[in-house]
Amino acid sequence: MSQHIAKQFDAELEAVRARVLQMGGIVEQQITSAIEVLSTGNIEQCDRIIEADHRVNALEIEIDEQCSHIIARRQPTAIDLRMILTVIKTITDLERIGDEAAKIARMAKNLHERDTLQIPRYREIKNVSEIAVDMLRQSLDAFARLDIAVPAKVVRLDEQVDEEFKTIVRKLITFMMEDPRTISSSLEILWVAKAIERIGDHAKNMSEYVVYLIKGKDVRHVSAEQLEREVEQ
């Protein structure tokens, strides 16, 4: 490969990476806004979050097409090929996170259209959502900086999100048993909590792809301890 073509190839890869980070920024804002409207009940903001999901979907298609063109034209190998595969996997998870954020916005809209005055377990929901957003932010940062030390931290945070989710479920069940009038709103919040738990799972996936990108090893379905040992080798 000539130096000129190599520079073009590097520029194409960098452009794709930049689009992934742009997509990640939109998705991160979606989640933050979706949790906010649970409290505020701003219907217009709910609609904007749902509209942003269309932009995320369009970006996924655009980046996917860019990756297909790069593979066809450049026939990348080794770490360059792993970069393209990592991008394709990452945008799939980002698109699914966007779907979950839009789902939360729709549930918030439903709750406030029914004039629900108190959102059950809102403080816990906000706390766990902040952990999930932090996971997403760290995963995107690891991708941007090729930081192999981050994924194990994200996996540990995912374990925390899973535990928080279980706690919220237990509290909601107790809440519904004590006051059956809260069943409808509590079920909506249960689905919000589940959406946040899934966001954490997708963010964890994204961090694990960074290890694959740098070391060429698949570290899905391993514990944080195993992952730490893997990246130290």
Q: Language-model segments: which ranges?
A:
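Cytosolic, long alpha-helical scaffolding segments
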Residues: 1-233
